[in-house]
C-alpha cells in the first residue's frame, strides 16, 4: 500500500455549497491557482450539468491551471456524465467523479421509480453506477465513484456497490460520511470492511469524504487514513454544506507534525496554507475564526504570562509547529504612510501578488490612501486591498477577480456612487443614497431609520429592484489600532437562497453600505444566470430528477 496521500480539494464544489458562499468564475480560477501553488493533487472544480457558470469554471480551470488534476462532478445520469466530460474535454489531466446515494434513508426518499422493493431499488442503483462509470471512461481513464451517505449505508450492500464499481473500472472509490454521523472507530471499521471486500484493494484508491456535523470530520479523515484510505477529500477552512467539511489545513498539518503516528506523507507546500485560507475567506465572505487551528489569527498567539515567558525562552514549550511553516508571520510586518514602493511590493510579492509594473502606480496610490486613514497597514488590509483592486490587466496578471465582478465575471448591477448621513438629537438618522446602475442610469433615494445603518439599508432597499430579506448583519475589527478597518458582513435571502456580501473600510458606515451592495449584486447575478443546482441539508448534492 502506498504511503502517499492524495489531497483532493473540493472547496470550489462542496465548499461552495455553504449558504452564501457562491463564488464568481474569476474568483474560482484565482483560488484554483492558489490551490496549485499549495500543490494539492486534485481540484474538484464544479458540477457542470447544474449551470453554464459551473461548466465555465470547470473548463477554465482544466485548461488554465497547471499541476493538479481537474475533476468534475456528475450524477449517474447520461446527461450529467456528458456535461462533465465535455467541460473537461480540453484539459490535459482530468477526472470525472460520479455518485449515487446508497443508504436506505436516501433510497426510500429519492428512488421511487427504481423499483417496488428495497431489493429491486438496490439492484437498480448498482446497475446505474456501473453504466455511469463505463460512460465516464469514454471521456477519461481517471474515474471516481462515490457511494453517497456511505456512513449510514448497510455494510453488505455497500460492499456490493463498491465491488461492482471497481469491476466497472472506477480508479477511486470514495466512502463519504455525508451527514457527519460516524464516530472515528465506526468509520475505521467501515473502511476496513470495504478494503476487505474489494477484489483487488491495490487496484483502486480508497477515499474519505467527511462532514463536520458532530465536529469529527478531521478525526474521521485521519481514522480513514489509518484504515487504508489514500485519498482525502477536504476544503480550505473546512467550508461546506451545513457544518462544513474536513479542513485541508488541519489534515495536512496533522500528517506533517505527527508523521510518526500516521507514517504517510502529503506533498503539500504548507507555507501557502494561510495565504490560501485568506484568499478563500475574502472570496466567500466567510471570516476565519481567530482560534481556527493552523490558519486562525490566534493560532500562534500567547497571552498568558507563563506561556509568553516559555515561548520567548523556547518556542517549542507551547508550539508544536512553526508559524512560518504554515504561512503565518512570526512577527507581523507593519506598513504605513512612510513605507516606500519597494517595501509595499516586496510584501505583496511575499503574499503571492506579482503586480505588473504598469499598474503599480495606481495600486500604490490606493495603498497611500489607505495608509492616510490608518497609522499602520497590516497584511489583512493588504489582502482586502488586492481583493478590491480593479482592472482587467491586473486581474489577468495576478489571477485576482476584477473589482465588483458579479457571477460569471459580468458587470455588477449596482455601484455605490455616494451617500450622506444626518443624525438628529433623538437618534433618528436620515440617509440619502445614490446608486449607479450597470446601464448607466442612476437612482437616488432617501430614508429615515433608527440609526445610520438602519436608515442606509432602508434607502438602498428603495433604490434597487431586487426583492430580498435581510438575514444577518455583523461587524468586526480586522486589523489593529484605534483606526482599524471594520469588516462588515451582510447576508440577504431571496426565496430559498442566501447571498453574502462583505466590505472593509475604516469608515464602518461606508463598509456597511458597500457590503449590502455586494450582497445585492450577487443576488442579481444569480437571478440572471439562474443556477439549477439544488442543495439539500443531508447530501453531497441533491439527486433531483431521478
UniProtKB/Swiss-Prot annotation:
Catalytically driven reaction(s): 3-methyl-2-oxobutanoate + acetyl-CoA + H2O = (2S)-2-isopropylmalate + CoA + H(+)
GO biological process, one term: L-leucine biosynthetic process
GO CC, any one term: cytoplasm
Names of the cofactor(s): Mn(2+)
Keyword Cytoplasm: yes
A Pfam match: HCS_D2
Residue intervals passing through the bilayer: none
Entry's EC annotation: 2.3.3.13
Domain called Pyruvate carboxyltransferase: residue spans: 5-274
Enzyme class: transferase
Region (Regulatory domain), start-end ranges: 415-546
InterPro entries, A to Z: 2-IPM_HCS-like, 2-isopropylmalate_synth_dimer, AIPM/Hcit_synth_CS, Aldolase_TIM, LeuA/HCS_post-cat, LeuA_allosteric_dom_sf, LeuA_bact_synth, PYR_CT
Task of the protein: Catalyzes the condensation of the acetyl group of acetyl-CoA with 3-methyl-2-oxobutanoate (2-ketoisovalerate) to form 3-carboxy-3-hydroxy-4-methylpentanoate (2-isopropylmalate).
Similarity remark: Belongs to the alpha-IPM synthase/homocitrate synthase family. LeuA type 1 subfamily.
PANTHER family, sorted: 2-ISOPROPYLMALATE SYNTHASE 1, CHLOROPLASTIC-RELATED (PTHR10277:SF9), HOMOCITRATE SYNTHASE-RELATED (PTHR10277)
Protein name, UniProt field: 2-isopropylmalate synthase
Organism in which the protein naturally occurs: Salinibacter ruber (strain M8)
